[in-house]
Amino acid sequence: MKTIAFDFDGVIHKYRDGWKDGSIYDEIDESMILNIRYLLKNNYNVFIMSTRDPDQIKQYLDRYLRIYEFNTEKRLFNVEVFPNSQKFWNKQGILGVCSHKAVFDVLVDDRAITYNGNSKDVIEQIINFKTYQKDLIDYSNFSKETFNSNQLRLPFKYQNCK
């Protein structure tokens, strides 16, 4: 079965203001949690790989999972930190968390470029790279009147999102 690694900041933790003071300050992306649950239920090995302290991530996830369980009476999954000496994560049904590069088949990351074997494309991709957050609309410069007017139009790619 495949092993799937997830980055934490920008993928699971929304991370809208960057690193800041190192705290985990933002909301969890609930759709990614449900994706992880789906993978775990379907016998994929899944772990989070981050430069953050894995205990910090585990505490954040445990707090969210307790709230979810209280509100829905459903347990999503358990979370376990694994040590730097462990290179493989293969505990079925449990989300692993580590701060080192462990072995994986697929990586889900908001700051990665897929290498397609053509080294000539890499430099251009690096120079032009933007995270998905950079494509989101910045509403900070809009006035209240703008939000209430008919002038506000979403870019085409967002028009059919619900």
Q: At which residue positions do the language-model features occur?
A:
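HAD-like aspartate-dependent phosphatase fold
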Residues: M1-K162
